[in-house]
Amino acid sequence: MTTDTHTLHIEEILELLPHRYPFLLVDRVLDFEEGRFLRAVKNVSVNEPFFQGHFPGKPILPGVLILEAMAQATGILAFKSVGKLEPGELYYFAGIDEARFKRPVVPGDQMIMEVTFEKTRRGLTRFKGVALVDGKVVCEATMMCARSREA
């Protein structure tokens, strides 16, 4: 149970995101303000299945999973800002722009994702995201998500 209204623990994250192991990439929400920003954490463990092949002897978190972790953080911010979806509605990852990778993320790192709301237009919501390890930027991108009914 959360004692601070600006923190979300894993139980609350599981209520908001449809992702499950091994694809749930947000461990905890550290802080958020509805409609403005969210800070979340991903604890990177050598036990994650993708490290077996990426890369043997030199495990590095795949860049697409860093982006996915940031996208999941934007999804949580969207859910907390807009409220519960109607039955049959989902948030979809709709696009990414200006993605840049600055340094590798390795097992043992604690990756902080910071996402900020930019604007909503024509059903698309735009977010700016940055991922950090030890206060240093490892990735940054602009992401869009769309609210849509299931097909």
From Swiss-Prot:
CDD domains listed in its UniProt record: FabZ
Organism: Klebsiella pneumoniae subsp. pneumoniae (strain ATCC 700721 / MGH 78578)
Protein name per the record: 3-hydroxyacyl-[acyl-carrier-protein] dehydratase FabZ
Biological process per Gene Ontology, one example term: fatty acid biosynthetic process
EC number: 4.2.1.59
Recorded GO CC terms: cytoplasm; membrane
GO-annotated molecular function: (3R)-hydroxyacyl-[acyl-carrier-protein] dehydratase activity
Pfam family, one: FabA
Keywords of the record: Cytoplasm, Lipid A biosynthesis, Lipid biosynthesis, Lipid metabolism, Lyase
InterPro entries noted in UniProt: FabA_FabZ (IPR013114), FabZ (IPR010084), HotDog_dom_sf (IPR029069)
Job description of the protein: Involved in unsaturated fatty acids biosynthesis. Catalyzes the dehydration of short chain beta-hydroxyacyl-ACPs and long chain saturated and unsaturated beta-hydroxyacyl-ACPs.
HAMAP family: FabZ
Gene3D superfamilies, sorted: Hotdog Thioesterase
NCBIfam families named in the record: fabZ (TIGR01750), PRK00006.1 (NF000582)
